[in-house]
């Protein structure tokens, strides 16, 4: 009886720890898409509960209607963006031409320090510049009200 009680208590403790141990991170908990001026932007959010843990943004530009001069201007903009994002320790930036399209990808972890840095640099627009975390629900609501399609 004593062994069964101990096993039952151990099981209850493990269940309690699992329940209190925090929520699992969900990859692609929400995805927002916007098409504007020939650019398709997609933002995917990883989240733990309502807290965004990572933002992945992909922007795709179809270059088929662009002149050589316009492509050079785009490339200069990409060079500037590469320099800007390279200065940020935890943020990943890449931009490549694939099948006649320019594909830009930015990955931003939203830990407090990185979030503060990208907000200070003006690379992530938020209502409160002293933000320490992002709410998935509020972020999705704001994007939807700005015309983004939410999945």
Listing of model-derived features with the role each one plays in the protein:
Residues 15-19:
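C-terminal motif of bacterial Sec signal peptides marking the signal peptidase cleavage site
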Residues 23-151:
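Subset-of-secretome marker
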Residues 1-4, 8-9:
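Positively charged n-region of N-terminal signal peptides that target proteins for export
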């Amino acid at each position: 009886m004593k062994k069964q009680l101990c096993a039952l208590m151990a099981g209850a403790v493990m269940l309690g720890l699992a329940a209190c141990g925090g929520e699992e991170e969900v990859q692609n908990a929400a995805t927002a898409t916007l098409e504007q001026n020939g650019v398709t932007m997609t933002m995917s959010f990883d989240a733990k509960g309502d807290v965004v843990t990572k933002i992945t943004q992909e922007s795709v530009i179809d270059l088929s209607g662009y002149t050589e001069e316009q492509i050079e201007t785009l490339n200069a903009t990409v060079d500037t963006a590469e320099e800007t994002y390279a200065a940020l320790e935890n943020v990943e930036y890449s931009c490549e031409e694939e099948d006649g399209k320019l594909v830009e990808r930015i990955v931003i972890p939203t830990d407090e320090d990185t979030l503060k840095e990208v907000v200070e640099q003006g690379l992530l627009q938020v209502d409160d510049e002293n933000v320490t975390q992002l709410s998935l629900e509020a972020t999705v609501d704001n994007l939807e009200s700005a015309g983004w399609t939410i999945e």
